[in-house]
Amino acid sequence: MPDYEFSPASGDRPRSWISKQVLIVLGVCLPVILALAIWVGVLTWRQSSMGATDHVSAIVLGRCLTYTRNMHPELRNQDCKKILNTFTSAFVSKDPCNITKEDYQPLIDLVTQTVPCNKTLFWSRSKELAHQYSGIQKEMFTLEDTLLGYIADNLVWCGDPRTSEVKEEFCPYRNENCSSTATSVFWTVVSQKFAESACGTVYVMLNGSRTTAFSKASTFGSVEVFNLHPDRVHTLHAWVMHDIGGVERDSCLGSSIKELKSIVNQRNISFFCQDDYRPARFVQCVRHPEHPSCSVLM
């Protein structure tokens, strides 16, 4: 058999040189790939989380003192430090996705406040206007005008099984894998209590600039309306408000309001609806005095 010897063809490189090139490329690219993977992981985690409010405990205590000492001195006997401790005990050192209504029950039992009959105002997708209205009509109470609603409004909080402190970083979003967050369960519990305590004629402010003014997926549609007691509440007035200059997508004649009326009537509660309730419309027109729809009111 002939003894052939193959030499590298023109342009070929020895295998050792190619191995060195591969190592150099890996040395340059691998850190970039790892950094990208970490960044994607962090981004995914942040997308499933929301920023916890810094210094939640201090804010809750401060708001409680402001509310009971200045805004509603008739509640001066409420122990704000005890309220804070009971509030945080509901979720600290616990799985942030597995909070229960029972966790907040001691807080509900502790805070006693009576909203006068005929002064309860619910809202759905109209928070800003409802608060502006109740801010002028001081005798009206939205949930956030009560002590428990006031101390927690616009805050985000949660705990961690690994620590006894309130978490100051990120809290999980409420989703199908985390449906019982500390914040969402709190609002469900206090919303239920707010509705159960209502009496006489109650009111709800709805947003007719949305496709559906009433939604059974909202807190009002899923919790509050079903916890109105017919032996305490005899009438529900709905105010369907529309944005100044906006599109009127729903009204008292719409299908969603008919659904609300059916739910309320089945609970033996009378129902009335009014589009663009005049006193609330005046509040809207403060910011748009020159708009034709506001000029008509003057």
Curated annotation (Swiss-Prot):
Question: Can you tell me which residues form the catalytic site?
Answer: 117, 199
Taken from the record's topology, the Cytoplasmic segments are 1-21
Q: How does it sit in the membrane?
A: Single-pass type II membrane protein
Catalysed reaction per UniProt? NAD(+) = cyclic ADP-beta-D-ribose + nicotinamide + H(+); 2'-phospho-cyclic ADP-ribose + nicotinate = nicotinate-adenine dinucleotide phosphate; NAD(+) + H2O = ADP-D-ribose + nicotinamide + H(+); nicotinate + NADP(+) = nicotinate-adenine dinucleotide phosphate + nicotinamide
Catalytic activity, EC? 3.2.2.-, 3.2.2.6, 2.4.99.20
Q: Which GO terms describe its cellular component?
A: endoplasmic reticulum membrane; intracellular membrane-bounded organelle; plasma membrane
- Provide the GO MF annotations for this entry: NAD+ nucleosidase activity, cyclic ADP-ribose generating; phosphorus-oxygen lyase activity; transferase activity
Instruction: Read off the Pfam families from this record.
Output: Rib_hydrolayse
Write down the glycosylated positions.
98, 118, 177, 207, 268
The residues exposed to the Extracellular compartment are 43-298
Q: Where in the cell is it found?
A: Cell membrane; Microsome membrane; Endoplasmic reticulum membrane
InterPro entries linked: ADP-ribosyl_cyclase (IPR003193)
Q: List the disulfide bonds.
A: 64-80, 97-178, 158-171, 252-273, 285-294
Expression by tissue: Osteoclasts.
Is-annotated flag, keyword Secreted? no
Transmembrane region positions? 22-42
Q: Which family does it belong to?
A: Belongs to the ADP-ribosyl cyclase family.
Q: What is the role of the protein in this entry? A: Synthesizes cyclic ADP-ribose (cADPR), a second messenger for glucose-induced insulin secretion. Synthesizes the Ca(2+) mobilizer nicotinate-adenine dinucleotide phosphate, NAADP(+), from 2'-phospho-cADPR and nicotinic acid, as well as from NADP(+) and nicotinic acid. Also has cADPR hydrolase activity.
Q: What is this protein called?
A: ADP-ribosyl cyclase/cyclic ADP-ribose hydrolase 1
